[in-house]
Regions:
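Charged catalytic carboxylate motif
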Residues: 2, 32, 36, 98
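N-terminal capping segment at the start of a domain
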Residues: 2-28
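Charged/polar, solvent-exposed surface patches and flexible loops
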Residues: 5, 9-12, 39, 43, ...
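Conserved small/polar residues in nucleotide/adenosyl-binding loops
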Residues: 14, 98-105
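Short, acidic Gly/Pro/Ser/Thr-rich loop/turn segments
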Residues: 17-18, 66, 80-84
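A non-catalytic alpha/beta surface segment that caps or lines the substrate-entry region
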Residues: 22-70, 74-76
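Active-site cofactor/substrate anionic-group-binding motifs, chiefly glycine-
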Residues: 76-100
Length: 107
């Protein structure tokens, strides 16, 4: 699956947060996406994949042989969306612009 296809799949998940919740993640709906992401990470070859009790999906990519002593990097993001708008029944679309130009401005 291409990157754009993956992103469009992810935004189709209803991950609306609940500001009244005292749990992490704030809704069970967010766990659906987290578990989906964990399965994708496994399919992509990541190791030690897990979703922890606080709603973090984690996995590791082994170092390239010979580079095990190099610094590592981590990426983090959130899966919840605003409680102010419904996350249900989202139909994402892409719009391609083939010709964009900035208007000239004067100082």
């Amino acid at each position: 699956m291409e990157l754009k296809e993956r992103f469009l799949k992810y935004v189709g998940f209803d991950t609306q947060s609940d500001p009244e919740s005292e749990t992490y993640p704030s809704t069970a709906k967010q766990l659906i996406l987290l578990n989906y992401l964990a399965e994708e990470m496994k399919e992509l070859g990541l190791e030690d994949v897990e979703v922890d009790a606080n709603g973090y999906a984690m996995g590791t990519i082994p170092a390239t042989p010979g580079y095990e002593d190099r610094p590592v990097i981590g990426f983090i993001s959130h899966v919840d969306t605003s409680p102010d708008m419904s996350g249900a029944d989202i139909h994402p679309r892409t719009v391609s612009y083939t010709h964009l130009r900035a208007h000239e401005t004067s100082a």
